[in-house]
Amino acid sequence: MALIGPKTTIAAVFIGPFLVACMLGIGLVYLLQLQVQIFHVKDTIRVTGKPATVSYTTSTPVTPVATTLDGTTYTLIRPTSSYTRVYLGSSRGFDTSTFGPKTLDYITSSKPHLNSGRPYTLRHLPKYMTPPATWRFGL
């Protein structure tokens, strides 16, 4: 032991375990990245515990169309979710006027018609929160 000086002993005691810890840390980070790639967690915005199935078809499905008495046809959009409250815009906030889930029914535009068991109106909102006169349902 006379050949190993005090500086060499300090290096062996402190630097050796430090190097081993660094190598272990790099290995663990690599394994974590590999696990994330395997389970595709990095491709999702929010991970939930709800199981879901996504199906893809090679053929284009038939789009539902409604035809009025005068011959006008409307393409119907079918939303896939039901909501317990509906966001009415930044100045009006959330609509919580009816109880139970609000299921979006077939609509002809991006503004939904709601099927919640009773007609959906904006009368429950205060005067300053009502939409402008140019806004119409389904437009």
Curated annotation (Swiss-Prot):
Chain ranges passing through the membrane: 12-32
Signal peptide: none
GO CC annotation, single: membrane
Pfam families according to UniProt: Corona_NS4
Keywords (A to Z) from UniProt: Host membrane, Membrane, Transmembrane, Transmembrane helix
Subcellular localization: Host membrane
Entry membrane topology: Single-pass membrane protein
Family statement: Belongs to the coronaviruses ns4/ns4.8 protein family.
Name assigned to this protein: Non-structural protein 4
